[in-house]
Amino acid sequence: MAGQFEGRVLVLGGGSVSQCTVPLLLEHIVKRSDQLTIMDFQDMTPRFEDALKAGAQFVIGKVEQSNLAQILSQYVSRGDVLIDLA
C-alpha cells in the first residue's frame, strides 16, 4: 500500500534503525520512492539496495553546524520531513 505523503523525506543516518525505518517509509508514508533521500557520512548503499533500486537516493554527506542550512535546503523545505536517525 502506497502512502499519501507528497513531500520529500530526508533520513539522516544509515545505521540499523534507518535500515528498519526506510522500508516502512516506502510502504506506508511516501507516494513515490524518489521522494526519499538517505544521508550518511559513510557509503552505506549496500544496506539500502532495495530502496535504491526502487528509486530512493543515497547521499554521502555530513550535516554539521557550519553547513546545516546549505545541506538541509538542498533536500527539504517547508512541508517536507526530516528524520534524524544518526
Question: Can you name each region flagged by the protein language model?
Answer:
Residues 80-84:
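N-terminal Rossmann-like NAD(P) cofactor-binding module of classical short-chain dehydrogenase/reductase
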Residues 22-30:
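Gly/Ala-rich phosphate-binding loop of Rossmann-like dinucleotide-binding domains
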